């Protein structure tokens, strides 16, 4: 059984995929600080912020065809990790 946090993220992702701008704003506010801090472990803070912004924008722009087989949380952190390594 999924926990409340995961269920909330599933609902949030579904809303984003339907084009709900408020849901995307919520996703952005929820994940931006954590993802920036995580990305900053690999690159300078300014670069981490840009990587996170690009990642979240990519989610929005590709929302209609986006398929996430893992959790949203895992997907976002892996995306930032990979983009940070490419940036190095």
Residue ranges, per PLM feature:
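Short, charged helix-capping/linker segments at alpha-helix termini
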Residues: 2-3, 17-25, 36-54
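Structural recognition of an alpha-helix C-terminal capping motif at a helix-to-coil junction
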Residues: 50-57, 70-82
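Conserved small/polar residues in nucleotide/adenosyl-binding loops
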Residues: 86-88
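Regular secondary-structure segments
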Residues: 10-17, 56, 60
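Hydrophobic/aromatic residues within well-ordered alpha-helical segments
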Residues: 27-31, 35, 80
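Short alpha-helix-to-loop micro-motif enriched in aromatics/charged/Gly
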Residues: 64-69
């Amino acid at each position: 059984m999924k926990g409340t946090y995961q269920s909330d993220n599933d609902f949030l992702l579904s809303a984003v995929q339907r084009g709900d701008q408020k849901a995307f704003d919520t996703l952005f506010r929820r994940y931006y600080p954590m993802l920036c801090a995580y990305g900053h472990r690999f690159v300078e803070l300014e670069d981490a912020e840009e990587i996170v912004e690009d990642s979240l924008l990519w989610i929005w722009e590709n929302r209609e065809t986006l398929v996430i087989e893992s959790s949203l949380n895992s997907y976002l952190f892996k995306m930032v990790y990979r983009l940070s390594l490419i940036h190095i």
